[in-house]
Each structure stands twice: as C-alpha cells, then as structure tokens.
Amino acid sequence: MICRSFPVCSTQMERKKAGMKCVIFAGLPAAPELHSWWADADYVIAADAGYENACRVGVEPDLLLGDYDSAPRPEAGAKTVFLPAEKDDTDTYYAARKALELGATDVVIVGGLGGARLDHTLANLQTLVFLAKNGVCATLADTDNEVTALLPGTHRIQRSE
C-alpha cells in the first residue's frame, strides 16, 4: 500500500521541514496554549480582527490585511493592505492568497473555527481546500480541533496522544 502525506504533514517538525510556514490570525481569539503553532512561523499575517488577536498573545504580524469592518482600522503603513468592504471573499481567504503568493508551503489559520459566524467557519474550511489544491499543507487550529483538507488519494493520519 502506498500512502501519501501530501498535503497532510504528520508532525509540526515535518511541517517546518516542508518550507516557508505562514500563520494567519483570523477573527476569533487565539488561545495562548496554541503557541506552538505560531512559534516557528516564518511569516505572520493578521486578517482584520486577527491583528488584535495576535497582539493579545504577543505576536507582531508581518502584514495586516482586511476591510476592518470588525476591528479598528490600523494606521496606514508599509505592512498594511486595506481591502474593500464589498467583496466576494473573506479577509482570511485574501490572507491565504497572500501567503500562497509569498511562497508559503505550510499555512496555519488560528482563530478561524467556531464563533457566531458559521458562514466564516465554512469559508475557512473552503480556504483549506483552496490551499491544498495549490500544494500547501494547511490547517485550521483551535484549542480543541485541528482541521486539514485532504485531497483525493491515500492518506496516513497519525493518532495524536
């Protein structure tokens, strides 16, 4: 039996070996116990309210991106991309596209599961599929869940203890 691990990376060590790791902070608060997900990030993007969430856990993003409909608008700067309020995709999806454009091979989205906006959770799940189809090992992570999109094929998933 041939098992593929692409795009699933079984350990964080494997993920780091894969190439550039980008962490995206989305709109829901990030728990400090998720520190291991962003500690070794090569690049950090904060999508809209994700900026406040990153700051709460002591992370200074490399790029701020969003329409700022759910957070105070930051001062314009070289590391800020302002998106139009009227658009077809979420701020987190735009952040994922930016990560892909920057050459990320591993993307972790924190603050993208649950909350009052089911539409955003579903959009974030679709974002995982988009990233997987583009060859990126991508995960949505919170304190209780790790979600990864699997493309057709055979996969070996290691049980977490």
Question: How would you label these PLM feature ranges?
Answer:
Residues Q12-K17, V136:
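Charged/polar low-complexity intrinsically disordered segments
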Residues R15-P74:
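N-terminal beta-strand-loop-alpha-helix module at the start
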Residues I24-A26, D48, V110-G112, A141-D142:
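Short beta-strand segments
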Residues P32, R117-H120, V147-L151:
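Short, well-ordered, mixed-charge alpha-helical segments that flank or form enzyme active sites
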Residues A49-K133:
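Acidic/Gly/His-enriched mid-domain segments of enzyme catalytic cores or analogous surface patches
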Residues F130-E146:
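Short, acidic/small-residue loops that bind anionic groups at enzyme active sites
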Residues T143-N145, L150-E161:
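Long, charged alpha-helical interface segments
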